[in-house]
């Protein structure tokens, strides 16, 4: 359990499509390889979101196949070959749509939680 006693959320606990949106958002920060994406998700979420390789890499391949990510082989910080992902124009459009839908959903859930007391 991470500091603060917060239980990590595994990919299986996320709403469908959430991992794709989070990956697209992380990649807006600049070209990054898969391991870097998982680490950045963990760091930014303060150890709440933990994405295993078995979930991350199929998602990256799916996003690349849809044309939302572009990938290029390069050298990682430890000198190994790694596939670096960056957001495509189509991916930017999709991310805007996903963020809008997420904000609408989060607002609806917040409204229910506030009134159901």
Question: Where do the PLM segments sit?
Answer:
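Amphipathic alpha-helical dimerization/coiled-coil segments
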Residues: 2-5, 90-117
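Basic amphipathic alpha-helical segments that dock to polyanions
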Residues: 56-63
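Short beta-strand/turn micro-motifs at beta-sheet edges
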Residues: 9-13, 73-74
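Amphipathic alpha-helical recognition patches that constitute DNA-binding helices
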Residues: 18, 22, 82, 86, ...
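Beta-hairpin "wing" of winged helix-turn-helix
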Residues: 64-80, 86
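A positively charged, amphipathic N-terminal helix/segment that binds anionic biomolecules
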Residues: 1-9, 85
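N-terminal helix-turn-helix DNA-binding core of bacterial DNA-binding proteins
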Residues: 11-55
């Amino acid at each position: 359990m991470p500091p603060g006693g917060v239980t990590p959320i595994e990919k299986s606990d996320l709403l469908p499509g959430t991992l794709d949106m989070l990956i697209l958002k992380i990649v807006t920060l600049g070209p990054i390889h898969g391991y870097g994406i998982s680490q950045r998700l963990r760091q930014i979420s303060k150890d709440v979101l933990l994405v295993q390789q078995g979930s991350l890499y199929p998602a990256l391949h799916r996003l690349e196949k849809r044309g939302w990510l572009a990938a290029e082989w390069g050298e990682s910080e430890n000198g190994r070959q790694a596939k670096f992902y960056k957001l495509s124009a189509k991916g930017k459009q999709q991310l805007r749509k996903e963020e809008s839908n997420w904000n609408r959903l989060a607002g609806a859930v917040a409204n229910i939680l506030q009134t159901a007391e």
